[in-house]
Amino acid sequence: SSAASDVYKRQFLGGLFGGMNVIKGQAFYGTTGLLHAPTAVMQKDKTVMLGGNMLDVNILSRYWVRSEYHPYTYNYYINCTLFPWLEVAYTCTLVKGIHGSSYWPQQTWGRFTNQDRSFHFRLRAWKEGWWKAWTPQVVIGANDPGSHSSNGGGDIDWGGGGSGNHNYLTRYYLAATKHVEFSGIGTVGVHVAWVIGKAMSDVHYSRPAAGVNFHFGMKGEGFWQKALNGFNLMAEVCPGHAEDLHTATYTVNVGGTYSIWKDHINLIAELNDGKFFSGGIFFKLHLK
């Protein structure tokens, strides 16, 4: 009967979308955040995330903006929130052999043959609402903070300098986040950060970043309410490089995530600077 069919549909959608809390944006660095802009949002204690992305090379360091990569490269990562105040991640970005290079064997030219490895850390310095209800959460973070200065040897370089340095994603930041809930509609997150970019083969900068996200929280058991509640929409203004690749500028990025099963399986997509598409998928497990 149609009544029974409606019951089964509600049960199915409840299992598919139910049980979700406010979804944290998953940055393309493989850490919690917006799309590229840092935030102070933390995952639940003992959360493990596994994911991968298809990345337009224009959003990366100039190292990837070469003919071998157009239009995309890829990354994959594992991320763990060890404590409520500490998140760590290990990310690998695929690398191709460079045409005409004496470093890369000829059979690797133009083929994915290696990967750039990077570590990422986020430390919560202040929890949202600790002092007053209006006080934001504060996080200190680092992406790809250190690498050997000479192609795997030599001293550790923390700043993206040296010809043999592989710090292609290096940046440091201080971020603050505040959430405002609209009952029966959703939750807005407001995020500001100061970002110091020191990536190898890229422009260096010390600039602010800002963004907002909106996670639907519609009341009701209908199909559309449950479907909408999977969306976490994002917009940000983030430091980056201009199209000449040598000038620091800002990019306006829009995108979001969509949870297709109880926050365990999530999709992410963005338009960087309104024209460069990247997308990915990540899986989330709560071990506690």
Question: Residue spans of the language-model regions?
Answer:
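Active-site proximal loops enriched in glycine and acidic residues that flank catalytic Cys/His/Asp
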Residues: 235-237, 269-273, 283
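Outer-membrane beta-barrel transmembrane domain signature
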Residues: 17-20, 25-26, 56, 165, ...
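A short acidic, amphipathic alpha-helical/loop segment
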Residues: 77, 254-255, 279-281
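Outer-membrane beta-barrel "beta-signal"
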Residues: 118-121, 210, 274-288
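Sequence/structural signature of beta-propeller domains
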Residues: 261-264, 276
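A cross-taxonomic marker for long C-terminal extensions/tails that follow the last structured domain
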Residues: 250-251, 270-276
